[in-house]
């Protein structure tokens, strides 16, 4: 994993670079602005990247590796097709920025004059968001064994909120990145019957069920308010940050539920993950809600290199589209979101032609898009279950929906903004697809 992630953040535009590439760029004048503005968020102590790029002494040994990564566009991690959609968190480098880094590396990676350096970037220690107003941490460390399959662990943490809270920045952070595959932090509102047997602070594993028991449980859960996804942690996933006037709602008396996916790596470890959030300074005009178009009714045949799965969801009232995030596992190949409007027109919102499980990103629209009432979001994904997929755990197996990485998922997450007093449960109608070919 380190080989894929060591250059996380060599990305985006450098402020103040000259229109023409200087014949001998220097670190302080030409390269540091790129690292500082986009890269040091992760390339600093305690963050995702395994080495910091805060100083010349730290970055200089990696000059040739940085050059190779940006020339081949392996870095920055931005797999979206540039022909569809504009995104405010676009990490891709311009041609000029690439040429500047190449010229710097090829001319000996010169240090230059420290007086040319911009002021040091300011970060909140331990967070990718502003200083949190509230932090919720697992009450106890979870012991991850050195080997074996680890069931998803659900940990309920009461919010203690006595009044509704509006949240406009939020981040889930693993305590031990070596063993945490992903975190999903849910808000469980008062009256919810989801995971009703879980005790606060105690890791809970849902009981295995047959079809009838699962059907009855879901019917029971549907009689109460559903949980809402707040934020997740996964490789490459940035913290959640919303624009002014928009926020997510955490109702008074809610619980937070951490869904923890641990992966054994040959060495036993301990984890104590946490959730941080920044409260909106005033009630927002719009509530942001995470929805999804998913399909769990598929069977990917052994050896199939291009198996197609579709999902759809229709939006009943006008909303604003905030962001998109496709999710698959190791056999995921490509993913496309298309909006079908009630006028009969359609538009590709996002195309990820080379999906990479190691880089799961939210794509925040540069200009949030109006979705008229009756808009259908249609997702199409392809999976490569052939021996030619180097990430494939086993090309001889038929693959179905499942939590573990060697199983598969097909989920098109997206956030929408609506009037803050609207009930999001009234907004969506999801089409149920059968197996491909049905």
Predicted feature descriptions by range:
Residues 4-16:
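Bacterial N-terminal signal peptides
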Residues 1, 16-22, 430-438:
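Basic/polar N-terminal segments that are highly enriched at the extreme N-terminus
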Residues 16-161, 169, 253-259, 264-266:
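Aromatic- and Gly/Pro-enriched helix-to-coil junctions and flexible linker segments
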Residues 30, 323-324:
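Short, hydrophobic/aromatic alpha-helical segments in well-folded domains
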Residues 82-87, 117-166, 171-320, 326-438:
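Beta-strand-centric surfaces of beta-sandwich/beta-rich domains
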């Amino acid at each position: 994993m380190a080989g894929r992630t060591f250059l996380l953040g060599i990305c985006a535009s450098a402020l103040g670079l000259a229109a023409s590439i200087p014949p001998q760029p220097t670190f302080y004048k030409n390269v540091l602005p790129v690292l500082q503005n986009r890269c040091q968020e992760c390339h600093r102590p305690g963050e995702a990247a395994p080495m910091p790029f805060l100083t010349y002494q730290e970055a200089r040994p990696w000059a040739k590796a940085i050059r190779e990564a940006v020339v081949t566009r392996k870095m920055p991690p931005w797999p979206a097709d540039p022909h569809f959609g504009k995104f405010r968190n676009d990490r891709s480098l311009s041609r000029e920025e690439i040429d500047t880094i190449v010229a710097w590396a090829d001319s000996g990676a010169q240090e230059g004059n420290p007086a040319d350096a911009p002021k040091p970037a300011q970060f909140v220690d331990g967070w990718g968001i502003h200083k949190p107003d509230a932090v919720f941490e697992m009450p106890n460390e979870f012991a991850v064994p050195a080997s074996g399959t680890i069931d998803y662990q659900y940990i309920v943490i009461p919010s203690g909120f006595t009044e509704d809270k509006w949240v406009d920045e939020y981040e889930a952070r693993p305590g031990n990145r070596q063993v945490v595959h992903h975190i999903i932090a849910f808000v469980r509102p008062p009256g919810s019957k989801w995971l009703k047997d879980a005790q606060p602070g105690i890791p809970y594993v849902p009981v295995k069920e047959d079809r009838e028991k699962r059907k009855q449980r879901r019917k029971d859960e549907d009689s109460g308010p559903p949980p809402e996804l707040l934020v997740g942690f996964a490789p490459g996933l940035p913290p959640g940050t919303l624009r002014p006037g928009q926020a997510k709602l955490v109702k008074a008396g809610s619980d937070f539920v951490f869904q923890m996916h641990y992966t054994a790596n040959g060495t036993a470890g301990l984890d104590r993950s946490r959730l941080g959030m920044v409260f909106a300074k005033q009630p927002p005009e719009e509530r942001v809600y995470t929805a999804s178009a998913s399909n769990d009714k598929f069977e990917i045949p052994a050896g199939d290199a291009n198996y197609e799965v579709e999902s759809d969801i229709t939006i009943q009232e006008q909303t604003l589209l905030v962001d998109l995030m496709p999710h698959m596992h190791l056999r995921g190949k490509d993913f496309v979101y298309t909006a079908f409007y009630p006028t009969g027109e359609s538009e590709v919102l996002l195309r990820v032609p080379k999906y990479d499980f190691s880089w799961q990103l939210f794509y925040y629209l540069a200009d949030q898009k109006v979705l008229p009432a009756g808009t259908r979001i249609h997702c199409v994904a392809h999976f490569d279950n052939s021996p030619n997929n180097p990430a494939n755990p086993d090309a001889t197996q038929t693959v179905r929906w499942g939590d573990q990485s060697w199983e598969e998922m097909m989920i098109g997450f997206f956030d929408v903004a609506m009037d803050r007093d609207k009930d999001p449960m009234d907004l969506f109608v999801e089409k149920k697809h059968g197996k491909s070919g049905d």
